[in-house]
Structures are given as C-alpha cells and as structure tokens.
C-alpha cells in the first residue's frame, strides 16, 4: 500500500504525494534537500501534523548529505522549525532527531538520521493503526441500531494527514475493512476544501461517501441520522 512519504531506494532522497494537486491530479514530488522538505511543508504539499513531523525528520536526514557537523544540523532544524511554527509534531520530531544525532560523531550521523526518520514514520503508522482498532469499538458502541453506520467528518484526518491509516478516519477504514456497512458524510471544509481530500481518500478505499456543504452539516445532525461526528478543524 502507498504511504504519503517514503525513501527512494538506493538514493538519499524522499518521495512525497503532492497534495496541492489533489483531488484532480495524483502526483509525486521528490525531495533532494532540506530546502525541498521545508518548501513542501510551507506550501502544504504535505499537510497534517503527523506527516509534517515525519517530513521534517527526513528533511534533517537530507540536510546531512554533504556535511554532518553541528552547525549544519542545527541550521537545518531552524529552517524546518520556521516553516510551521505552531505545528506540535514538527517541533517534537526535530527535537527527537537532534537528541539522537547530536551525541554522535559526524561520521555516524547520516545513517543514524535515516534510520531514526524511518522509525518515526513506522511508529506513526502503528499508532494510527491502533487508533483505528480502538476507535472502531467506540463507533460500534455508539451506533443507533443495526442499520448502516452513518459518520460525519470535517477537514481531513485520514492517511493523507499521516503516513498511513489516518487518525480520526482510521476507525472508518477499520470498519469498512471489517465488512461493516458504513457511509461517510464529508463536509467540504471551507476555505481550503480539505473535505475534497477526504473524499478522494475514501474513493480510493471504496468507502461510500457523500460530500456536503458546510452549512448542511448542522441540518444532518439535527435530523438525528448521524451515529458519530469525527474530525475537527477549529474548536
């Protein structure tokens, strides 16, 4: 299965899904440098807190390709940190990478950086998978009856916002994969229309869904036909 970010085999480079082209075009961008990684975060080619953190971790690994001294490492971390100052996962990932790399001699840092970035990515996948397992039980416990499970979601909290599986959408995928009859109401999420990314994801997975205007969400909830509402952009 495709992830949102992955290292290029046999090369010191990383491929990402260019999310600015979705849902109309599927494209992959190759990152060769820390500047490429910073631009990908800044331009929202990658988005979602978990994915931003993983991209930053790989950005530090890319930064050490030619020089792995302290100045290069710290300058790269500052560049990446400035791309999204409020992104918690970004700063967490950079701090973890620096904690792992700074005690090492420069000669050992490149391989260690790629290894740690891969570990952070794999940990995110596992965490999201477990969110799906746990969240599915909550969805089933709160369903209104034996009919179709009706879910409403806002913004995008699926695998495009992480490395795989997603956060709030992970239980939806877990339900569908378990053969549960499920339908998702996707709010468009103005002004950036992240709901279209959610709809694209769901279509790739085969999950039945309907995109609705943000203003229609309240009506659907008021009618009492929604089992659960997941995902938030602003609270």
Could you say what each language-model-derived stretch is?
Residues 219:
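Feature captures the catalytic cores and cofactor-binding loops of soluble hydro-lyases/lyases
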Residues 149, 227-228:
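Conserved acidic residues
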Residues 45-212:
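N-terminal active-site beta-alpha-beta segment that forms phosphate/nucleotide-binding
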Residues 224:
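Active-site charged/polar residues at nucleotide-handling catalytic sites that mediate phosphoryl
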Residues 21-22, 36, 158, 191, ...:
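Short, glycine-/Ser/Thr-/acidic-enriched flexible segments
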Residues 233-235:
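Conserved small/polar residues in nucleotide/adenosyl-binding loops
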Residues 1-35, 39:
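Positively charged, low-complexity intrinsically disordered leader regions
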């Amino acid at each position: 299965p495709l992830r949102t970010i992955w290292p290029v085999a046999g090369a010191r480079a990383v491929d990402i899904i260019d999310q600015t082209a979705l849902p109309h075009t599927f494209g992959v961008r190759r990152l060769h440098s820390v500047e490429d990684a910073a631009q990908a975060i800044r331009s929202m080619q990658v988005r979602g807190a978990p994915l931003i953190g993983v991209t930053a971790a790989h950005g530090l690994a890319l930064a050490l390709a030619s020089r792995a001294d302290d100045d290069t490492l710290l300058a790269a971390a500052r560049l990446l940190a400035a791309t999204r100052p409020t992104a918690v996962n970004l700063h967490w990932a950079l701090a973890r990478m620096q904690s792992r790399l700074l005690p090492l001699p420069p000669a050992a840092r490149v391989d260690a950086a790629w290894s740690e970035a891969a570990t952070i990515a794999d940990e995110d996948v596992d965490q999201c998978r477990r969110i799906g397992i746990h969240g599915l039980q909550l969805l089933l416990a709160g369903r209104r009856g034996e009919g179709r499970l009706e879910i409403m979601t806002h913004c995008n909290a699926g695998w495009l916002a992480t490395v795989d599986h997603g956060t709030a959408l992970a239980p939806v995928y877990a339900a569908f994969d378990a053969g549960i009859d499920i339908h998702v109401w996707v709010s468009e999420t103005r002004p950036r229309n992240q709901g279209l990314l959610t709809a694209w994801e769901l279509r790739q997975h085969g999950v039945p869904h309907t995109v609705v205007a943000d203003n229609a969400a309240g009506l659907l909830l008021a009618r009492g036909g929604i089992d659960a509402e997941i995902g938030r952009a602003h609270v």
